[in-house]
Amino acid sequence: MSNDQNMFGQELQKAINEMKIPVTLSPGQKNTFQSFYQDLTETNKVMNLTSITEEKEVILKHFADSIALHLAVPDLDKKPYRIFDMGTGAGFPGIPLAIAYPELRLTLADSLNKRILFIQREAEKTWAEECKCYPWKG
């Protein structure tokens, strides 16, 4: 594991701990979050996914905030919940939830097909089995 990967994972776990979210990410999950961050910022250069792109801000405002659902649903890590993320945008909170809680069954929907295509590519890399992505217009 490179020093950059280690630092990213440490910063992410620190943000989760500071929010008192009862989750300890595995090294593999931390690597997946970093890979998603890299894909997000690269894709954001050609497709408007998010205005938040600085690493520490993404860790706090996208990743840790998404995982904070655990505070409202304390047994989130103990049951195979089904979650529908309508208007997912760049995949928040759905993608971070899927990485942190692989047993969740997620459906992500967004009105822009190009965002759904980005999310589907990410799903194929990591947690495709329990995540479905659909274009949706309300």
Regions flagged by a language model, labelled:
Residues 49-77:
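SAM-dependent Rossmann-like transferase core, predominantly class I methyltransferases
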Residues 1-54:
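N-terminal auxiliary segments of SAM/dcSAM-dependent transferases
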Residues 67-138:
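Conserved SAM/SAH cofactor-binding pocket of Class I
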Residues 31, 57-60, 110:
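A generic "alpha-helical surface" signal
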